[in-house]
A protein has these predicted regions:
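Rhodanese-like catalytic fold shared by cysteine-dependent sulfurtransferases
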Residues: 425-477, 485-516, 522-572
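A Rossmann-like FAD-binding core segment of flavoenzymes
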Residues: 33-35, 77, 83-104, 111, ...
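Glycine-rich dinucleotide-binding loop and its adjacent helix/turn
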Residues: 118-180, 215, 269, 275-277, ...
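Rossmann-like dinucleotide-binding cores of NAD(P)H-dependent redox enzymes
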Residues: 67, 160-161, 168-226, 306-312, ...
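Beta1-alpha1 glycine-rich phosphate/pyrophosphate-binding loop at the start
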Residues: 5-85, 174-197, 336, 409-418, ...
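N-terminal Rossmann-like dinucleotide/flavin-binding domain of flavoprotein oxidoreductases
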Residues: 26-115, 198-215, 220, 353-358, ...
């Protein structure tokens, strides 16, 4: 039921970046008479968080480009009172007031509200280890953090940096610091960068980072920091320390929910604020949006923390609608994201294979390496796609793509398909725009659908990377590589023998029909053709998902990660 709303109500918003600023503007568009007050602890409102690493790297050169609005411009357009450098220190739900401190003057006062929106965001995770307060250690979350790092670089001209953490901020900083000419090492406990990706797909990200000179120390635990020789030693468990001129902590973020906890709001996973689908908290007239709130994962239905700008903006709009008498509902987050990694683009949506299995879903995947556009048109680039679907229903669950062109377009199509509840088999039916410079007549998304349909119809049976070492080498199965003789000589999986696909029909007599045949080629296409030839001649055959290109990239990356001096990282 829609609530009745008061034209002259007073709305107080805590936090003036993505969710808070969106809510303020939406309320004004719906209600010209409401009094709207926003308190922002930093000195900036509505700033571009995602652009901060690019200012450090001189890609964005004008500081003013980081701020989408100023308090003055926001008031001029929306008549919203934006109070920067003001920290809300307490919420009093029974009195419907908040305690506020002016960080410039020290003045403290009480502000009343009819409706309250919490948009406090998240704070950088600070490990409880020695040395985190050193002057040469930095975090990056706000414009002030950015200016602090930028000023340090300009004044001291550091030649090396260690980044603790391999998520979005860590990778974007690594690229930008490398572009400034610095030696860069990423160190973290997990053995892969970018947790939204499966480890196999993350291998392509690792390779791109190494190609551009970023050293990776994966699977290493940071135990502390010490000053030495004008720089910082990064102390590692069971390893020699790393030495650098500066260190940036980018190990993740935690919900900023101290206010909510002290006010008695219900909290969820990792201390996040529990809200319903109207963005209402457990206390009447208090709403919460953005990185601090617990949401439902759209694919799994489980509680999740998804810190992304898109969901925060949508949530701010929904809270505003409901405050102004509407009945808007948040249907969940699916974690659609994209990142630039030097020349590569990596993108993901939905749930990856690893997390899908952890939630108890019985899933399968297809992996393919299509061209970004028609192969005969110059400039096409190979991308690697992994599509995750539920075995029993073929429900589309997620996708990951890495490549150098056309990645963002395909991930957005797949994200839309997930939101629409499509089955993976129906991807073949999508009517997508085609011209040789932009795509192929059978778009990569269509190709993924064709592959899943072949599985559903029994035309295609697959074997996967994790099966490679488990396949018997005792002659009980046939291990067949259908690439050219030259490709096979350049590298192949131990135990496989070579019959090029174009010679297969003439050489069927070399194979035993009583044995299952496990087939591989470079990308998966020729081996699929070989499987159809074999099946048509009475063989039981299985096609390798991803091809030797995929196998080689992943296994080489795993060897580098496990090496004693991870990827050649510098020692102290």
């Amino acid at each position: 039921m829609q609530e009745r709303w008061n034209d002259n109500m007073k709305v107080v918003i805590v936090g003036g970046v993505a969710g808070g600023a969106t809510a303020a503007a939406r309320i004004r568009r719906l209600n010209e008479q409401a009094e709207i007050v926003v308190f922002e602890r930093s000195g900036y409102i509505s700033y571009a968080n995602c652009g901060l690493p690019y200012y450090i790297g001189d890609v964005i050169t004008d500081r003013s480009d980081l701020t989408l609005q100023t308090p003055e411009s926001f008031f001029s357009r929306f008549r919203v009172n934006m109070k920067v450098r003001h920290e809300v220190t307490a919420i009093h739900p029974e009195e419907k007031t908040v305690s506020v401190k002016n960080l410039e003057t020290g003045e403290e006062f009480e502000e009343s509200y009819d409706k309250l929106i919490l948009s406090p965001g998240a704070k950088p995770t600070q490990p409880r280890i020695p040395g985190v307060g050193l002057d040469k250690l930095f975090t990056l979350r706000t414009v002030e953090d950015t200016l602090h790092i930028k000023d340090y670089i300009n004044a001291n001209h550091p030649k090396s940096a260690v980044l603790a953490g391999g998520g979005f901020i860590g990778l974007e900083l690594a690229e930008n610091l490398r572009e400034l000419g610095m030696d860069v090492t990423i160190v973290q406990r997990p053995k892969q960068l970018m947790n939204p990706f499966d480890a196999d797909m993350a291998s392509f990200i690792h390779n791109e980072m190494r190609k551009h000179g970023v050293k990776l120390a994966l699977g290493h635990t940071v135990e502390g920091f010490e000053e030495r020789d004008g720089g910082v030693d990064v102390l590692l468990k069971d390893e020699q320390p790393l030495h650098a001129d500066m260190v940036i902590l980018a190990i993740g973020v935690s919900p900023e929910t101290t206010l909510a906890k002290d006010a008695g709001l219900e909290l969820g996973i990792k201390g996040s604020i529990v809200v319903n689908d109207r963005m209402e908290t457990s206390i009447s007239d208090i709403y919460a949006v953005g990185d601090a709130v617990q949401v439902k994962h759209f694919v799994t239905g489980q509680d999740a923390l998804i810190s992304l700008a898109g969901p925060a903006n949508k949530q701010g709009r929904i809270a505003a609608d409901n405050i102004c008498g509407g009945d808007s509902h948040y249907t969940g987050s699916q974690g659609s994201s994209v990142i630039k990694i030097f020349g590569m683009t990596a993108a993901t949506t939905g749930v990856n294979e690893t997390n899908a299995r952890k939630t108890g879903l019985d899933v399968d995947t297809v992996i393919l390496s299509p061209m970004s556009h028609a192969g005969y048109y110059p400039g096409g680039k190979v991308m690697t796609m992994k599509v995750v679907f539920e075995k029993a229903t073929y429900r589309l669950l997620g996708a990951q793509i890495v490549g150098y062109e056309g990645v963002d377009k395909r991930i957005d199509v797949l994200a839309t398909a997930i939101r629409a509840g499509m089955k993976a088999t129906k991807l073949k039916d999508l009517d997508l725009a085609y011209a040789p410079p932009y795509s192929s007549a059978k778009d990569p998304v269509n190709m993924a659908g064709f592959m899943v349909e072949n599985i559903a119809n029994g035309v295609l049976k697959q074997w996967h990377l994790e099966d490679a070492d488990r396949l018997p080498r005792d002659g009980s199965v046939t291990l067949l590589d259908t690439r050219t003789v030259e490709e096979f000589a350049h590298g192949h999986i131990d135990g496989f023998f070579n019959i090029p696909v174009d010679e297969l029909r003439e050489r069927l007599g070399e194979l035993d029909k009583r044995k299952p045949v496990y087939v591989i080629c470079q990308s998966g296409l020729r081996s699929y053709i070989a499987c159809r030839i074999l099946a048509g001649n009475g063989f039981d055959c299985y096609n390798f998902s991803g091809g030797f290109r995929f196998y080689d990239a992943v296994t080489n990356d795993r060897c580098l990660i496990e090496s004693a001096t991870a990827c050649g990282m510098d020692r102290a």
